[in-house]
Amino acid sequence: MELILTRIAKRKAYTIGRLSIIKEVNEEYKTYEQEEYFCDTLEPPALELKTTVSKEAVLRSPAKARSLKPFAIPEGRYAVVISWSPRFRAWLPILLGVPMFSGIRIHAGNTAKDTQGCILVGRNQLVGQVLESRKWLYELKQKIVEAKGRGESVWLTIK
């Protein structure tokens, strides 16, 4: 199963995106067919450094990255699995192979403060927030479990 997160609003305090599920992948041309909107997302702000330190230097240095406020994870394609989160005491999707990050989860929450560096799902009906987050998290987990049950890998592409 392919998930696509398209960032549509990059603000100082948050990033809003649209999460879509790909119904069909054209293997010959490696293109997506039948992209279906699923829900909205909320993340920390996208990283845009305006200092003498380059973005590449920060991404190479875990110490520098930890000293910054939480920021949105880099664009890319990441494997998604569901695992137990001791912090949230729940089974939640987690992204694997994110450069410089570990424990990036998709979880419930409403505001940028709730993201804790992760991705929140819901409906963006208020500025800078997502609503009905638990409902959309449940729906997403169901889709992931169904895909895994069919023997499919689950991938999230962030762009």
Kindly give the residue locations of the regions a language model identified.
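Cell wall/extracellular polymer interaction/catalysis modules
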Residues: 1-154
